[in-house]
């Protein structure tokens, strides 16, 4: 607004202003409201007057200090000419206002990244990164133990043991060694010397300082991840469960970590909630520090647990064979009261070294050894030594035809003359049914909806989206839900049509004509036998026909046969049916379990041979002693 007294307009935006365009030469009067984002536009050519900007500031919003007294003075008398703008505060010769640094405020905006020199020298950066990394791993371990106790029914003893193991593991890793920083700086210096030799002098600018700072940070992080890997929290959890005699297996830990039921992949989001933002005390974000590249496998996890126990000097017991074997038998629907006592005798007699954790990643896991003991116990109890039990089951199914009730595995009538054969037949039928029921897949892979939710909550957690991206996501979700409903309706219609056309009249044979199911179906026994042969070939096994007669009462040791330039395993069908569900439950290859069974049987045969020799020696000593005590006749 204009001054009624004819004084000059205030410098903070009052009154009008006359501007002349630099391009077209047109001059015009502009008011305060004519500015667009602080700039005035020519009314003739629409050019922007860059020389003048409307700041719309009020001098009364600032404190009246001696340095500001000359900034504005309310005009009380008309003056012929306006006073010039005051000089900047930095150029004032008088007492200047205090800087922002003196008021305790940061010199840089908080919304922007910190400068290269904000974290101090490399020693301070190393200390900050190391302290944040170790504390963050401890928070992740704490969350994992809480999930094990609350969701997976692990005892509190395992949680208390994990704390002690973790502290000893951190101490053994020497992550807080005073010489660690100097070693890392020496490595970084040698790397920089190699790079500086290939650069010219003009490249050594201020931007190189920030690059050097970043290289230091990631060098420290790489070293910390080698000494204390992120997956070491999972290894400590499994090791604590092992010492506490829990039935938790490495496969359970890996599956829960992959599915998000155990905080691991997305655990870095919980670190900031407990420790605060990492930007306050560490140049690296929590995602860079604790985001794992992949989930470790079960074999590597067990080897990592054994390595930690070896480094901290922890004497480990063997696996809890009784509870783990009981769990496996229960999942396979096998009689626990009959099988478990015999398996425990073999365990106490043989005591194989594979039942203890090892730091060797190439050794057979301990759960495979437990499975091998159970398989040997089943072979001894039920006499599964290649007598053709599965072939007899296939012939029985072929005889009963296509009647589903008569061909069911559990509908076989027992033979009163040979109850052991019936037990073996029922065992193989139960194992064949249990093999199809075992589900080793992840929960998120069951359907697309659960997989998308898994990706949102676990894989891409911590990522932010714009409003437009969120709107597109909502649109795609609505499209997916609509198509999903349509697919469900179509599947329901197809199921109803199949039920109508599979009653024995409208079923189409391969030649294109409709006939009864019996006229075009192959014998069920031949189908079952051909199916098991093809599956054996896929898994590296060769089918062997049943044995006609037993050569000996010892263990049946299978050898390997050369086929197409490679060695493959040979086995009978009944033994393969016994082997297959145990391997699937242990999540290992069938050949690995087969090799473990052969190794255990050789060990048992060697022990039995040594025991027999010892008994014979004792008997001979007893006979010699009795001969010496016998009186000599005249």
UniProtKB/Swiss-Prot annotation:
- Name one process (GO BP) from the record: RNA polymerase I preinitiation complex assembly
Q: What is its main location?
A: nucleus
Q: Where is this region: B-reader?
A: 51-80
**Positions of the UniProt region annotated as C-terminal cyclin fold:** 282-284
UniProt lists compositionally biased (Pro residues) regions at: 77-87
Spell out the InterPro entries in the cross-references: Rrn7_cyclin_C, Rrn7_cyclin_N, TAF1B/Rrn7
Region of interest (B-linker), residue spans: 81-83
- Listed GO MF terms: RNA polymerase I core promoter sequence-specific DNA binding; zinc ion binding
Question: What are the start and end residues of every segment in region (Disordered)?
Answer: 54-107
Q: Alphabetically list the UniProt keywords.
A: DNA-binding, Metal-binding, Nucleus, Transcription, Transcription regulation, Zinc, Zinc-finger
Which stretches does the entry tag as region N-terminal cyclin fold? 84-281
Span of zinc fingers (RRN7-type):
19-51
Decide whether keyword Nucleus is in the record. Answer: yes
Q: Which residues form a coiled coil?
A: none
Question: Which residues fall in a compositionally biased region of kind Low complexity?
Answer: 88-98
The role this protein plays is: Component of RNA polymerase I core factor complex that acts as a GTF2B/TFIIB-like factor and plays a key role in multiple steps during transcription initiation such as pre-initiation complex (PIC) assembly and postpolymerase recruitment events in polymerase I (Pol I) transcription. Binds rDNA promoters and plays a role in Pol I recruitment.
Similarity remark: Belongs to the RRN7/TAF1B family.
Q: What is known of its domains?
A: Although it shares weak sequence similarity with GTF2B/TFIIB, displays a similar subdomain organization as GTF2B/TFIIB, with a N-terminal zinc finger, a connecting region (composed of B-reader and B-linker regions), followed by 2 cyclin folds.
| Name this protein carries in UniProt | TATA box-binding protein-associated factor RNA polymerase I subunit B
Its lineage reads: Eukaryota, Viridiplantae, Streptophyta, Embryophyta, Tracheophyta
């Amino acid at each position: 607004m204009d001054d009624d007294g004819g004084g000059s307009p205030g410098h903070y935006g009052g009154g009008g202003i006359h501007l002349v365009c630099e391009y077209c030469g047109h001059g015009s009067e502009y008011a305060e409201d004519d500015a667009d984002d602080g700039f005035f536009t020519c009314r003739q050519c629409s050019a922007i007057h860059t020389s003048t900007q409307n700041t719309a500031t009020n001098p009364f919003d600032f404190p009246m200090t001696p340095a500001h007294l000359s900034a504005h003075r309310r005009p009380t008398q008309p003056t012929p000419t306006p006073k010039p703008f005051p000089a900047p505060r930095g150029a004032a010769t008088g007492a200047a206002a205090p800087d922002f640094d003196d008021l305790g405020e940061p010199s840089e905006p908080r919304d922007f990244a910190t400068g290269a020199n904000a974290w101090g020298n490399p020693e301070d950066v190393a200390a900050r990164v190391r302290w944040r990394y170790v504390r963050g791993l401890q928070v992740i371990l704490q969350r994992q133990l809480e999930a094990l106790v609350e969701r997976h029914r692990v005892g509190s003893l395992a949680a208390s043991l994990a704390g002690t193991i973790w502290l000893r593991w951190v101490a053994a890793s020497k992550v807080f060694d005073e010489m660690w920083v100097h070693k890392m700086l020496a490595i970084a210096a040698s790397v920089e010397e190699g790079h500086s030799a290939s650069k010219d002098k003009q490249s050594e600018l201020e931007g190189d300082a920030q690059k050097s700072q970043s290289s230091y940070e990631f060098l420290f992080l790489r070293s910390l991840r080698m000494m204390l890997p992120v997956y070491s929290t999972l290894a400590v959890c499994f090791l604590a469960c092992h010492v506490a005699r829990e039935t938790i297996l490495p496969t359970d830990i890996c599956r829960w970590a992959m599915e998000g039921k155990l905080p691991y992949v997305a655990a870095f989001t919980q670190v900031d909630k407990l420790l605060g933002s990492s930007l306050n005390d560490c140049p690296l974000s929590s995602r860079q520090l604790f985001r794992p590249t992949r989930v470790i496998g079960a074999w590597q996890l067990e080897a990592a647990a054994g390595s930690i126990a070896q480094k901290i000097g922890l004497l480990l017991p063997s696996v809890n064979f009784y509870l783990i074997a009981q769990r496996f038998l229960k999942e396979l629907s096998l009689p626990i009261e009959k099988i478990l006592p015999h398996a425990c005798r073999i365990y106490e007699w043989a005591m194989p070294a594979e039942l203890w954790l090892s730091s060797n990643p190439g050794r057979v896991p301990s759960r495979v050894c437990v499975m091998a003991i159970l398989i040997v116990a089943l072979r001894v109890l039920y006499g599964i030594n290649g007598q053709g039990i599965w072939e007899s089951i296939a012939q029985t199914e072929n005889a009963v035809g296509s009647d589903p009730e008569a061909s069911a595995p559990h509908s076989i009538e027992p033979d009163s003359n040979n109850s052991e054969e019936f037990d073996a037949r029922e065992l193989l039928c139960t194992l064949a049914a249990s093999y199809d029921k075992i589900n080793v897949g992840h929960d998120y892979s069951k359907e697309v909806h659960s997989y998308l939710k898994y990706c949102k909550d676990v894989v891409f957690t911590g990522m932010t989206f714009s409003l437009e991206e969120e709107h597109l996501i909502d649109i795609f979700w609505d499209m997916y839900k609509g198509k999903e409903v349509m697919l469900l309706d179509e599947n329901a219609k197809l199921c109803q049509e199949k039920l109508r056309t599979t009653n024995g009249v409208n079923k189409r044979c391969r030649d294109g004509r409709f006939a009864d199911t019996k006229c075009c179906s192959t014998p069920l026994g031949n189908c079952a036998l051909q199916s098991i042969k093809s599956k054996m070939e896929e898994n590296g096994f060769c089918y062997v026909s049943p044995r006609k007669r037993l050569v000996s009462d010892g263990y049946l040791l299978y050898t390997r046969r050369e086929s197409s330039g490679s060695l493959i395993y040979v086995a009978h069908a009944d033994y393969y049916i016994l082997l297959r569900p145990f391997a699937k439950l242990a999540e290992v290859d069938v050949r690995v379990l087969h090799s473990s069974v052969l190794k255990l049987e050789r060990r048992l045969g060697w022990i039995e041979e040594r025991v027999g020799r010892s008994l014979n020696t004792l008997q001979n000593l007893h006979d010699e002693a009795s001969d010496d005590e016998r009186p000599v006749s005249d």
